[in-house]
Amino acid sequence: MNDDQWVAGISKKDAGRYSRQLLVDDFGVSGQKNLKNLNVLIVGAGGLGCPVATYLGAAGIGTIGIVDYDHISLDNLHRQVAYKEDQVGKSKAQALADNIKLQNSDLNVQVHNTSLDSSNAMQLFKNYEIVCDCTDNVATRYLINDVCVLLNIPLVSGSALRWDGQLSVYHYGSDCPCYRCLFPSPPDPNSVTNCNEGGVLGPIVGVIGSMQALEVMKIAAKVRTTLAGQLLLFDGREGKSRTIRLRKRDPKCEVCGDNPTITAPIDYVLFCGAGAHDKIENLKLLELSDRVNVTEYRNKRREQKPVLLDTRPSLEFEIAHLPEAINVTLKECRSLSAEDISNRLGLQNTEHSDVFVICHRGNDSQRAVLLLREKLVDIKFRDIIGGYEQWALKINDMFPLY
């Protein structure tokens, strides 16, 4: 026998690079080969997308596509750990692609620096075999789900908020439900909270994103114990997780059922009643006569100390507030009696007939005005347009933005 001959299951380079995962039961050489031939699309290059892309890139996925239209901002860095300070302002999709290529130069990374919508999703998805939903809004979740079903692509979906995270695999196997099977109708837009409003801890998205990457690797390696048909719930505060079994595919589902009525992407903004993005939309609930801008309020407070009601949760109030602000949260505006609110604001000991109402961005303050003027009919409540965000942008640039 010739000493220079051997049977190679994998190249010397790949054996050296991926040796530790080649030694894992149920993964091995076949799993690594499957990874190398796999095309995975990551939708969203934020807190979830960063660990998904980082771990899949390191694991040796053949092609990774990244879809995101947004740019890196300073308040991303605590949870979007693939980015650095000197990348603030740059394209997330491009920066994430560049960073994972630095870790593994063999990767083929496709950058889709665009907003995903009904007009381009089918074209974007058709060249990929697994999709990871790393987004943070309901409309895009329905869009991603429907397109994955229409193209018969497994969907690995994660979400995270505050201390908690969730993870599931949809449309993978004949009995596995899709997202629409479980949620045929979207939630009320006013009941939905994303991390821009509710906050999230960085390690939470790190855990969920890492597990999304793991599910992709399990699907690629054909490991039978995936989260298809199950929902993993992670409680970071308690350090606990549990898995619940989901109901099976709904034969009456509009997109994956026996007689589907959705055979192409629809208008998801119309369907959900909310935009397909995670930005906070500025509401217009009040007439202009019931509102003042931050410049007008600044002029008022220079004349005399006004009564200022701050509707933000106490955690946000602690970050920063104007000296005259009195913290009565939106929840308290709903629950407290007129007398209690009057006492909190000190209205019984003052001749003030005007009360100004402020919040983070000017949405909750409008909701509060609608509530308060029903309870205290003799008081003129006025919302401050744009809230503290506009105060920081136009009046005092040292006021903390968050």
UniProtKB/Swiss-Prot annotation:
What Gene Ontology terms describe what this protein does at the molecular function level?
ATP binding; metal ion binding; molybdopterin-synthase adenylyltransferase activity; molybdopterin-synthase sulfurtransferase activity; nucleotidyltransferase activity; thiosulfate-cyanide sulfurtransferase activity; URM1 activating enzyme activity
Q: Where does the chain bind Zn(2+)?
A: C178, C181, C253, C256
Keyword Protein biosynthesis in the entry? The reply is no
Q: What is its EC number?
A: 2.7.7.80, 2.8.1.11
Pathway listed for it is:
tRNA modification; 5-methoxycarbonylmethyl-2-thiouridine-tRNA biosynthesis; Cofactor biosynthesis; molybdopterin biosynthesis
Per the entry, the cofactor note is:
Binds 1 zinc ion per subunit.
Q: What is this protein called?
A: Adenylyltransferase and sulfurtransferase MOCS3
Fetch the Gene3D superfamilies from UniProt. NAD(P)-binding Rossmann-like Domain, Rhodanese-like domain
Can you cite a GO biological process for this protein? Mo-molybdopterin cofactor biosynthetic process
Q: Which PANTHER family match?
A: ADENYLYLTRANSFERASE AND SULFURTRANSFERASE MOCS3, UBIQUITIN-ACTIVATING ENZYME E1
Instruction: List the catalytic residues.
Output: C195 (glycyl thioester intermediate), C359 (cysteine persulfide intermediate)
Which keywords does this chain's UniProt record carry? Answer: ATP-binding, Cytoplasm, Metal-binding, Molybdenum cofactor biosynthesis, Multifunctional enzyme, Nucleotide-binding, Nucleotidyltransferase, Transferase, tRNA processing, Zinc
User: What would be the name of the gene that encodes this protein?
Assistant: moc-3
Quote the HAMAP family the UniProt record gives: MOCS3_Uba4 (MF_03049)
Q: Which cofactor does it need?
A: Zn(2+)
Q: Where does ATP bind?
A: G47, D68, D75, N76, L77, H78, R79, K92, D136, N137
**Family indicated by similarity:** In the N-terminal section; belongs to the HesA/MoeB/ThiF family. UBA4 subfamily.
Q: Which reaction does it catalyse?
A: [molybdopterin-synthase sulfur-carrier protein]-C-terminal Gly-Gly + ATP + H(+) = [molybdopterin-synthase sulfur-carrier protein]-C-terminal Gly-Gly-AMP + diphosphate; [molybdopterin-synthase sulfur-carrier protein]-C-terminal Gly-Gly-AMP + S-sulfanyl-L-cysteinyl-[cysteine desulfurase] + AH2 = [molybdopterin-synthase sulfur-carrier protein]-C-terminal-Gly-aminoethanethioate + L-cysteinyl-[cysteine desulfurase] + A + AMP + 2 H(+)
Name the InterPro entries on file: MOCS3/Uba4, Rhodanese-like_dom, Rhodanese-like_dom_sf, ThiF/MoeB/HesA, ThiF_NAD_FAD-bd, Ubiquitin-activating_enz
UniProt superkingdom: Eukaryota
Query: So what does this one do?
Result: Plays a central role in 2-thiolation of mcm(5)S(2)U at tRNA wobble positions of cytosolic tRNA(Lys), tRNA(Glu) and tRNA(Gln). Also essential during biosynthesis of the molybdenum cofactor. Acts by mediating the C-terminal thiocarboxylation of sulfur carriers URM1 and MOCS2A. Its N-terminus first activates URM1 and MOCS2A as acyl-adenylates (-COAMP), then the persulfide sulfur on the catalytic cysteine is transferred to URM1 and MOCS2A to form thiocarboxylation (-COSH) of their C-terminus.
